[in-house]
Amino acid sequence: MPTVTPDQSTVALAPGEILQAVEHEFHGAPWLDMHTHLFMPSLGKLGLWGIDELITYHYLEAELFRSSNLRPDQYFGLSKRAKADAIWKALFVENAPVSEATRGVIAVLQAFGLPTGTGGLAEARKFFEAQKIASHIHKVFELAGISEVVMTNDPLDPEEAPLWEDGAAPDKKFHPVLRLDRILNKWTDQVDVLAAKGFSVDRNLGGKSIAEVRRFLAEWFARMKPVYMAVSLPDTFQYPEESVRARLIAEAVIPSCREFGIPASLMIGVRYQVNPALKLAGDGVGKADLRALERLAAGFPDNRFLVSVLSRENQHELCVYARKFANILPFGCWWFLNNPSVVEEMTRERIEMLGMSFIPQHSDARVLEQVIYKWRNTRRTLAPTLANTYKLLAGDGRPVTREDIHRDVQRLFRGNFERFVGLS
């Protein structure tokens, strides 16, 4: 695309030029993906990539059982390759891959010039097996139009924690995040794990337990240098309440975030394991009581909260709370919401209520190559949405320039996050 000169950037755009100007910005400087489940190369086999991982992603596993007679217990007894073959046959050969998740696989194959038809997976497997991870990451990020991602790092994961303790090499393209799900949602299961690591804690948070949890968080903050702490929470989450989780949040997590100068990310609305037979694919969604968020934002005005809610029915309420509390930053269209029709609706509502003071999207990618189609979908879906916003503004009498669009796009897809977490 041609370079825009400074003179052109300040000229008012005609309505017919606005969409092209937005698309130009969307394909300009790379964006920052502020929540993923990807891993830097030094964390080794934790990082998932390649065609078999793409096809056996739990979104597609959930779809498999709607289009196949294969039972979950039969499926989970198969090898990785056999699982991928079963999903390919059911969702890509015997059915047109029209869902968001299946189209994503097609988009990745197309991006690498691989066959997208109903043939087998041999050529794709051969291609991915030949890749070297460092150069492959560079190519994937280039295709996705991103420069860096934010990881999800669990200090109590028995596979991940030792890698950090052994000095996993940092990578400027991968920002760490201290994930707290095990501590906050499965405290009784983790007490003995923490005790074995030398922390004096008990199930009821007696004695030095709170101080010891803060010591644990401080050690991992120093080790990881995370850009925020994060937790996913159920649709039943309440605050305040008489529970171990509420005490840990109020007395350990919130003060630690404040001490370290980083936000807490709250992802609210999961209904865990509604169908345990599906394993990772077995979680559902529920409408949450966001008065818990209200009380946290009001009770801890010196803390910052990144917030994403899983239920579509909670989105308007989250926007209202963000208008009332500047320490709340709504982000992304998470999980079941990451479908183009819902992304468009949510983004339009957020712009109407919050201007440009939110983060429209993150990929939530669990497999490396997913960032290609997830960010492609985001650009394709949101360019018309943002362009229409500017057309309405121009129609109301305010000229819109390329400079305006450049500023806003950079704010939405990089600047708001960098400012909120202190990277800028």
Where are these regions (language model features)?
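Metal-cofactor-binding active-site regions of metalloenzymes
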Residues: 2-260, 303, 319-424
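Histidine-centered active-site/metal-ligand motif
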Residues: 35-37, 267, 309
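Acidic, glycine-rich loop-and-beta core segments that form the ion-binding/anion-interacting portion
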Residues: 234-294
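Active-site-proximal binding-pocket segments
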Residues: 271, 275-282, 286-333
